[in-house]
Amino acid sequence: MYDPIFAKSFSKYEQKRFGFWAILVCTIMAVSIFLELKPGFHPLAILGNAMNLQLSIDAAQDKLAMKDEDISLPFGIHAVEQAKEGEQTDMLRVNDMGTSSPSATEAVESDPTNTSIVKDIDTNPPLATQAKKVETPSEELGEPACNFLGPLSDYCEIKGDIRIEANSSTVFIVSPQTTIAAKNKSWSTRPYARKGNGGAMISVKKWTIKLVSHNEDNIPRCSINHSIPSILFSTGGFSGNPFHDFSDLLVPIYSTSQEFGGEVQFLATDHQHWWISKYQMLFSRLSRHEIIAIDKEKEIHCYSRMVAGLKSYKEFIIDSSKFPHGLSMNHFRQFLRSTYSLERTRAIKLRKGGGQKPRLMLISRGRTRKLTNEGEITRMARKLGYEVIVAEAGLSTNLTSFAQLVNSCDVLMGVHGAGLTNMVFLPDKAILVQIIPLGGIDGLARVDFGIPSKDMHIRYLEYKIEATESSLIEQYPLDHAVFRDPSSFHKQGWGAIRSVYLDKQNVKIDLHRFKSTLVKALKLLRRH
């Protein structure tokens, strides 16, 4: 095994020390050779790969966090059918709800009947999937700071010499640099906060943001100079539906404009005069300046600062971590109260023997998902001690009057749909009762209204109907896939879900089952 003469030349201690150093030298040589041959295994390389992997995961999560057409909208004139043939239908909704609340997919997966969910998206990937990163602007060149990775919207913040040419839907940024790098210096955005939905975005104009050198030819000259910033947004998409009016437009417009303190000009593309008029009271509080229907402008409007698009990160929620001073839905609701003169800030607190009657508003639906026994529900609620109001808001409803009526209530109740959006006018500590129809849409219903209610300081209850409470039982046998396997309809796409579970389903509440929900609401009103 070893040379005895060599061994006799050294003491046992020296032999051990020599052996130790020999092993150490051999180890160092082996590691050096290994690293030389396999540089990818260098510790720094491993660290770098880990960082790149994490960044890739984060980016992928952001790109996948797209919200699709939600089941709450009344499918009328503003609800667009599937945008194009060949649309992918692999998932109905994906939404980034942050770490503080479950995502839409998590919410849907919490429903054991919901084994498959579908999504209705354009075959052309939305900007979220096309973007590879958040743009890091070059201040020297005057590049915009663009965020194309948000879950719901894309936007660019621009500073410098900004010129808007409406007839080409182009925002020019004129750089002081003599030459611009040969690489493409243009960006595009559709300024509406539902970017993952092909049905919504098909009616939203695409705008180009183009960086040019000041000495280039054909740069438009300013005809109107403005000393205030501007915000570009679209009133296309699903505007006209109450849920989308707030989630896609009013909440993002509010949160995007707050930093300007009223000194900002709104530029509305895809301008709909009736829509702006409906919410004129809100716009007049957000800006001291007129709204420009930018598509019709022949003048070249110039600004030194602009936000092209709206900042929206969560469904029907303001993500406080993304805005200065902890801006939240609580601030937005205070804004609504002051605008519409909503007097009540807190719901009633019931006391034993107090003789008080909490007011309950039942949202009535005229066409789809109707409550066919509204009268019976109303009578039962009154026997339990409620004062009951049955109401239905339409396009012609006076918004101020209706907001004040909702604010006078302590409980808002209705079948899943856009009418529940009126919870924004409720006082704090009020209760939202959402009746969820058949169809495996529980998770979607919670994302639309259940999760946002928490940020609004509203208590939330839900009542999930059974097959015997659905009008579908009159159309299909109980062993039909409509009842046994809603996921099979999800696989067929949004049209199948809408047709069967939303357009053709009405609800007849089992009074015995539902009574406990109304009793629970009363108990909640006894404690604040």
What are these regions (language model features)?
Residues 2-528:
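The feature primarily captures lumenal catalytic ectodomains
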